[in-house]
């Protein structure tokens, strides 16, 4: 029977499940470093083998099938799992299924793997995602140390919350998570033992130091005077493991370092258009990131949220939440919202079980085009963060000039591919998306260096270090609409190269909130 014979591969990657994630994860694994490049991928899905192969051929290319072996079966059936030779696999990715209760299916799949009587005695290396943060403890119990969990609902909510007042942040994360860009690596450098973290920052001409791993604990942007001890590892951003290039430290021009300090806004105002299961999580994250007395207005005609919002509002100390029941597809109703009085717009993909993913994205893009036109006509200055479900529609979001667009499944798929390559990366991502500790910020260049003069990145590193921050790159406003130039985002620049910054440009840093 086609797709029902056991595979004989070993050292392979097993992908369990069939969804849109397949078309992001497989190409990423093809170009991954850390020895994954030439490994076979065994895919177990609940579709006909030929159907899966045809879709892979059409969406990824014929060459993909030289490395992908498809098998038909259910990831929760132990007999079907045995087709994939799990005991010899170097990594296992559990995809999030479509349906009403995906977390339950993911948990059952993990149990089918770990409780199989034919399992190996050594721990598996499993990467899986749970949508609901309330299932975090259950995941830890079921995973029993064998699973690297991604809590996808919380990750997307946090990125939307962070992006809405930091245009370009989603591009920074895409650069860090996509194997076509620079990635996160861990290195031990005996030459830096006894030196400080601050000294380590400028030790490489190419390659950005972002943190330290001490005794299995990762700390991003640690105290600048932290001493490196034997066994400590640097957490770095580099093109690959050989991408760290030493060089003589370039001159730091003290006279070009600015002493300006940011003036925090007293409060923020955001309007959320659309609503989904991650809406409450988004409110929690906005409450974490926004100052007291900030305002949030939620607009949708799909649900009456008044009672639900009353219940959740008591725990939101920094937010005053209001609700309007209006259609976000109706131009007149959008204009009646007076968008110009808000600082930020978040466009959420509506939960609507009667629509396909493509139909939901079409509605989102339709609303986005209206918003952009209304904003331009009113000459309002506000940021727009948009959630897209299918990555193939991201090009359309670019045309509609979304400041940030977050493709939910693609982002989680990129994270899964990165973690199966090196599971230590998950600790870095958890730290980055945690409201406590250091996060990524895009701050005005004029807060660090004088604009209108040529400065190298060594000078920017020093300027950031004086604020107890770690600089990792910059964003040029003149390229903010150029997709081919990563919308102006440059991560891990050559530190010797000099750049002339303007008042509109941003320095990308790791900093405390």
Regions found by a protein language model. Name each.
Residues 1-513:
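Cytosolic regulatory regions of ion transport systems
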């Amino acid at each position: 029977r086609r797709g029902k014979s056991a595979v004989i591969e070993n050292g392979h990657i097993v992908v369990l499940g069939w969804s849109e994630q397949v078309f992001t994860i497989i190409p990423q694994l093809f170009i991954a470093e850390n020895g994954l490049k030439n490994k076979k991928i065994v895919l177990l899905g609940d579709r006909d083998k030929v159907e899966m192969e045809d879709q892979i051929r059409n969406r990824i290319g014929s060459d993909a099938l030289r490395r992908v072996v498809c098998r038909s079966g259910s990831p929760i059936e132990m007999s079907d799992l045995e087709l994939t030779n799990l005991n010899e696999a170097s990594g296992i990715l559990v995809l999030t299924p479509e349906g009403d209760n995906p977390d339950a299916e993911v948990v059952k799949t993990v149990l089918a793997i770990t409780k199989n009587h034919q399992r190996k005695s050594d721990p598996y290396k499993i990467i899986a995602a749970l949508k609901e943060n309330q299932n975090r403890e259950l995941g830890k119990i079921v995973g029993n140390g064998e699973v690297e969990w991604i809590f996808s609902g919380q990750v997307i909510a946090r990125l939307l919350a962070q992006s809405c007042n930091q245009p370009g942040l989603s591009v920074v994360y895409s650069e860090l998570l996509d194997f076509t860009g620079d990635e996160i690596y861990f290195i031990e450098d005996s030459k830096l033992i006894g030196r400080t973290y601050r000294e380590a920052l400028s030790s490489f001409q190419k390659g950005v130091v972002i943190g330290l791993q001490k005794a299995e604990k990762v700390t991003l942007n640690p105290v600048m005077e932290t001493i490196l001890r034997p066994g400590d590892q640097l957490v770095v951003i580099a093109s690959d493991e050989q991408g760290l290039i030493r060089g003589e430290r370039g001159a730091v021009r003290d006279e070009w370092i600015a002493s300006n300090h940011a003036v925090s806004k007293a409060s923020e105002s955001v309007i959320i258009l659309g609503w989904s299961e991650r809406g409450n999580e988004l409110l929690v994250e906005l409450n974490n990131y926004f100052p007291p007395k900030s305002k949030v207005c939620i607009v949708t005609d799909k649900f009456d949220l008044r009672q639900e919002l009353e219940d959740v509002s008591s725990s939101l100390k920094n937010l005053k939440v209001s609700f309007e029941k209006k259609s976000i597809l109706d131009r007149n109703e959008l204009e009646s919202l007076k968008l110009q009085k808000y600082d930020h717009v978040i466009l959420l993909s509506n939960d609507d079980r009667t629509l396909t993913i493509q139909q939901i994205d079409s509605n989102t893009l339709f609303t986005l085009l209206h918003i952009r036109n209304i904003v331009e006509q009113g000459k309002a200055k506000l940021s727009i963060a948009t959630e897209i479900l299918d990555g193939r529609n991201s090009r359309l979001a670019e045309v509609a000039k979304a400041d940030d667009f977050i493709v939910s499944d693609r982002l989680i798929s990129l994270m899964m591919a990165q973690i199966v390559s090196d599971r230590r990366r998950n600790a870095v991502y958890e730290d980055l998306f945690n409201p406590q500790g250091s996060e990524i910020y895009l701050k005005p260049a004029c807060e660090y260096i004088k604009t209108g003069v040529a400065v190298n990145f060594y000078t920017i590193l020093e300027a950031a270090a004086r604020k107890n921050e770690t600089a990792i790159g910059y964003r040029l406003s003149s390229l903010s609409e150029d997709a081919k130039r990563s919308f102006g985002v440059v991560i891990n620049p050559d530190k010797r190269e000099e750049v002339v910054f303007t008042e509109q440009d941003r320095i990308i840093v790791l900093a405390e909130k």
